[in-house]
Design a protein with these regions (language model features):
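Active-site glycine-rich loop that binds ribose-phosphate moieties when present
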Residues: 241-248
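His/Glu-rich zincin catalytic helix
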Residues: 46-130, 235, 248-354, 395, ...
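Acidic/histidine-enriched alpha-helical segments
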Residues: 123, 179-203, 290-299, 396, ...
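Short, positively charged and aromatic/hydrophobic N-terminal segments
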Residues: 2-5, 10, 14-17, 27-31, ...
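Short, low-order "capping/linker" segments at domain edges
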Residues: 201-205, 303-315, 420-429
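Short, polar/flexible loop-turn hinges at active-site or ligand-entry regions and domain interfaces
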Residues: 112-115, 157-160, 179-188
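M16 family metallopeptidases and their MPP-like homologs
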Residues: 75, 83-100, 120-175, 211-234, ...
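A short, acidic, amphipathic alpha-helical segment used as a generic capping/interface helix at domain edges
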Residues: 458-465
Length: 489
């Protein structure tokens, strides 16, 4: 349930005599729909959005959202009981053939800065902050590349001398991002070469992991004419070709053109206003001309593409890519998510119970909906000689759902599995930080509870309709050529 704490001055002009207006613990609140919420956010009228668990008056956690600059969002999540805090800066840019170049930026930034010229200096500073840790992540959200730098620490109330640990950790993070160590105006060549090797090793490890490799190859083939087909880390050749001059140019482009999300997840006692002011001070001289990018959704497949490769592994990898009939990320989302889960998202699903358990055709077999692109993947590990049987069985189970051959118990099991998964998001600051980061593309920052309520309203007829929108696009088979155990599968 979305409940917005609003400025009283806008009640009459924006809400009127809405029956949804009520008072809770001295706070005037109103239940609103998503369209009105988005309009109020744009007007800067919403102070806070609170989530109250269904049937309970106790506040679980609060979420504040503000736009503090051009395409710069500031999100704070506060919950009583957190013993640690997590703050992050995420930069979203269009996914292009320069993915390798941008993927290297978080690594080089967290290596040194003007104030902390070596890793040793940085580690000493983090040690004074009770062992705070810096982390980086590169992900793909739709046809966008998201570069994330984060810092995790103990909560302020555990500091021995009442220090503002979270704010000081954010200061270190901003120092790394906005004041990197340059020599003659560029990143140090030795440091760039070192980080290139590490990034190439990371990508190489993904190639060696055949389950990950097969999934990435499916996306590359299925979306060959779409930006989504590009690996979030780029290519080995792309990494090796990077120069320190090119990396410096890309870094400046990132600060200028990326959409930015500053997120802080902590105990309710942490003062986040000071963190916002600190960020604005560091970013004050940064020129901003943000570049917008919309993900292309392909609703259906006209033909099926089939590609087979071989590898020296025992277990074959069969990956099937489906188009979900979505025009955008919100197009019948709840029904399609439940459909994907009934199909292969949990131990009670069709793929698990029938294809894996009853027919014994797969070592593993599951489906996964990729909402940000409107596609669904089925990944399975099989004996290569069972390829045709496995493909047929997987498609047969999808047909069963299209015909409505599943029970209300199957539907309820999927809803319960998704509810449990979404509720676990609020278990830690890190999980909440990741949750809101995934929503950076459209600035539609909704709670896990919002989606749980969406799922509760999905009917069997909704799932049947969603299944009938699904079309098979691409099949990728990685055939094993080895009999021995022990390969990286």
């Amino acid at each position: 349930m979305l409940i917005c704490q609003l400025k009283m001055s806008i009640f009459k002009s924006k809400i009127g005599n809405n029956k949804g207006v009520f008072e809770r613990k001295g706070i005037f609140c109103v239940r609103i729909n998503k369209k009105l919420w988005k309009n109020l956010v744009k007007c800067g009228k919403i102070n806070r959005i609170n989530v109250f668990p269904s049937g309970s008056d106790s506040l679980k956690y609060t979420f504040d959202f503000k736009e503090i600059g051009e395409s710069i969002d500031f999100c704070t999540v506060k919950a009583e009981g957190f013993k640690t805090a997590c703050a992050s800066l995420s930069f979203m840019i269009p996914l292009t053939e320069n993915a390798s170049l941008f993927a290297l930026i978080p690594n080089i930034l967290t290596r040194s800065s003007e104030k902390y010229p070596t890793l040793t200096h940085l580690e000493k500073k983090l040690a004074t902050l009770y062992g705070a840790e810096i982390g980086v992540d590169v992900s793909k959200i739709g046809e966008n590349q998201v570069l994330k730098l984060s810092v995790c620490s103990i909560d302020d109330r555990f500091a021995l001398h009442n220090e503002k640990i979270v704010e000081e950790c954010c200061r270190v993070l901003f120092e790394l991002v906005f004041r990197p160590k340059f020599v003659d105006g560029v990143f140090l060549e030795d440091e760039v070469e070192s980080e290139k090797r590490l990034l190439a090793e990371q990508l190489g490890a993904e190639i060696s992991d055949k389950r990950v490799y097969a999934k990435n190859r499916l996306e590359e083939i299925m979306c060959a004419d779409e930006a989504y087909g590009i690996n979030r880390l780029g290519t080995i050749d792309g990494i090796n070709a990077i120069t320190n001059e090119e990396l410096t140019i890309a870094y400046k482009k990132l600060l200028k053109e990326a959409k930015v999300l500053l997120s802080v997840s902590a105990n309710g006692s942490v003062e986040t206003e000071g963190i916002k002011k600190l960020f604005l001070e560091y970013a004050e001289n940064t020129e901003r001309t943000p570049e917008k990018n919309e993900t292309l959704y392909v609703e259906s497949a006209e033909d099926v593409t089939y590609v087979k490769e071989t590898a020296p592994v025992k277990q074959g990898k069969l990956v099937m890519g489906f188009r979900l009939g979505m025009k955008d990320r919100n197009d019948d989302y709840a029904a399609k998510r439940i459909m994907s889960d009934v199909f292969g998202g949990n131990p009670n699903s069709k793929l698990f119970k029938v294809v894996r358990e009853e027919m014994s055709l797969c070592y593993y077999c599951s489906s996964r909906m990729l909402r940000a692109k409107g596609i669904m993947l089925v990944q399975s590990g099989i004996e290569s000689f069972n390829e045709e049987k496995a493909k047929t069985a997987i498609l047969d189970q999808l047909e069963e759902i299209k015909k409505g051959n599943f029970t209300e118990e199957d539907l309820d099991a999927s809803k319960k599995a998704l509810e449990d998964a979404f509720k676990s998001v609020s278990d830690s600051p890190e999980a909440l930080d990741s949750w809101f980061t995934t929503q950076i593309e459209h600035s539609e920052y909704l709670y896990p509870e919002d989606y749980i309520n969406m799922f509760k309203g999905v009917t069997k007829e909704d799932v049947i309709r969603a299944a009938n929108d699904v079309t098979l696009d691409t099949v990728f088979m990685l055939e094993g050529t080895e009999d021995e155990e022990g390969e990286n599968e």
